């Protein structure tokens, strides 16, 4: 029961050596060759890779053709390349987009592969997803939410394959995730942005005379509360937390120190990966007064996260970086529904707007508070409110005991998360957490 055939279809691209084919009129009759190898794999041991090219949570159209040049590096590595269509953040003329339909469509594609595994090339237990930005986010969601019951009604709605011919449940879990700059964990994305970046900005919507500068400070403070309740741990099992500081907003504590060390390690790696001569390393960092180079360990320290952000990672989005005050960000469309293309979704910002008094600022509009509160109560066509759909699109919901989804999904065992450390689209804490 596909909502749209333009998207809910897929293409499977297979190395030729995995097939024995004979021409039959205008088509070919093909059978799997299970003895031939490509890069050490056979047609039944080859990993399956699925690109999630959905930047900004956009749609991914199903393929209608292909170019070998674009696929050669995958096929020559022995991989099975599966390009599945999926709906994106925007509603279509005759279908609903937004959360959770994009990930639901990808899950349906994974289930299709497993249902037909006997007749298809590839190892059904070695499915890997990869993507950038919103595609990195949806890759992370797929990796964290395997077999989550929250998706059951949505999968049934589009007629996805739920059981095999023997009546066994079909899994939509994946083996691994490669996520570049994942724009995710949207329930706290706004507060993370203001804590990591916004609190150091003094222009635009963060200029001192604006009501949004006060909102920025309140959002940054809310992030500290979240982190202290989240109770993340470092590699040694130590709980990470934030503490009040004499300057800045909660820029002290073990969580802050951990973030600072991540930045320092990144620069240390950069120097050692790109220079062999110690004098060249010293020369590179000498232009930054906030960086100290240790020539014996070939490592760096920085004075503060604030100095790094001011120099390298400026806030490039307004306050309400993801849930825009005027519902103009891509993420507002992600949590729209069939009645409204774009809706507010940030419950923390809503609580702040409805509890704090910004009336002393001449540019404040009190209608924001009621608009946020109203939007959060909207439901989608399956009668789920925004918070449920946000949980479905939040990898952390499945990964930490802070959330109710912990240990209620099949989480991918293999992860690689990368980011441009200076990019201003999301807080560095998104990938770090």
Where in the sequence are the language-model features?
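C-terminal subdomain of alpha/beta-hydrolase-fold enzymes, centered on the catalytic histidine
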Residues: 275-433
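Primarily recognizes the serine-hydrolase "nucleophile elbow" in alpha/beta-hydrolase
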Residues: 115-200
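A fold-wide structural signal in alpha/beta-hydrolase
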Residues: 48, 75-87, 128
């Amino acid at each position: 029961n596909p909502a749209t055939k333009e998207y809910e279809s897929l293409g499977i691209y297979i190395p030729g050596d995995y097939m024995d084919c004979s021409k039959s009129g205008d088509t070919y009759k093909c059978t799997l060759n299970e003895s031939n190898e490509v890069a050490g794999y056979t047609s039944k041991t080859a990993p399956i890779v699925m690109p999630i090219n959905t930047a900004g949570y956009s749609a991914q159209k199903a393929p209608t053709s292909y170019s070998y040049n674009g696929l050669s590096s995958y096929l020559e590595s022995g991989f099975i390349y599966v390009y599945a269509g999926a709906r994106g953040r925007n509603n279509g003329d005759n279908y609903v987009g937004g959360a959770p339909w994009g990930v639901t469509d990808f899950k349906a594609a994974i289930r299709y592969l497993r249902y037909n595994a006997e007749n298809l090339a590839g190892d059904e237990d070695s499915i890997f997803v990869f993507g950038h930005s919103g595609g990195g986010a949806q890759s992370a969601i797929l990796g964290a939410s395997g077999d989550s019951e929250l998706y059951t009604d949505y999968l049934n709605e589009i007629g996805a394959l739920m059981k095999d011919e023997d009546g066994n449940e079909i899994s939509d879990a994946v083996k691994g995730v490669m996520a570049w700059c994942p724009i995710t964990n949207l329930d706290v994305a706004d507060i993370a942005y203001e804590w990591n970046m916004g609190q150091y900005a003094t222009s635009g919507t963060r200029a001192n005379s604006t009501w949004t500068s006060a909102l920025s400070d309140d959002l940054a403070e809310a992030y500290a509360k979240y982190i202290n309740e989240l109770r993340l741990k470092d590699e040694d099992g130590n709980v990470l937390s934030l503490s009040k500081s004499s300057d800045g907003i909660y820029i002290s504590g073990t969580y802050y120190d951990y973030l600072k060390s991540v930045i320092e390690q990144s620069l240390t790696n950069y120097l050692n990966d790109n220079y062999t001569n110690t004098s060249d390393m010293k020369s590179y960092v000498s232009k930054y007064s906030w960086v100290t180079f240790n020539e014996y360990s070939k490592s760096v320290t920085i004075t503060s996260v604030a100095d790094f952000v001011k120099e390298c990672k400026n806030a490039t989005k307004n306050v309400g970086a993801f849930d825009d005050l005027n519902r103009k960000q891509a993420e507002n469309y992600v949590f729209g529904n069939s009645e409204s293309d774009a809706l507010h979704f940030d419950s923390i910002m809503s609580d702040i707007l409805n509890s704090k008094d910004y009336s002393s600022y001449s540019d404040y509009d009190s209608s924001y508070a009621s608009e946020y509160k109203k939007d959060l109560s909207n439901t989608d066509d399956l009668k789920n409110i925004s918070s449920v759909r946000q949980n479905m699109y939040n990898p952390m919901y499945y990964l930490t005991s802070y959330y109710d989804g912990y240990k209620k999904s099949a989480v991918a065992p293999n992860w690689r998360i990368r980011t441009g450390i200076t990019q201003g689209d999301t807080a560095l804490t998104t990938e770090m957490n």
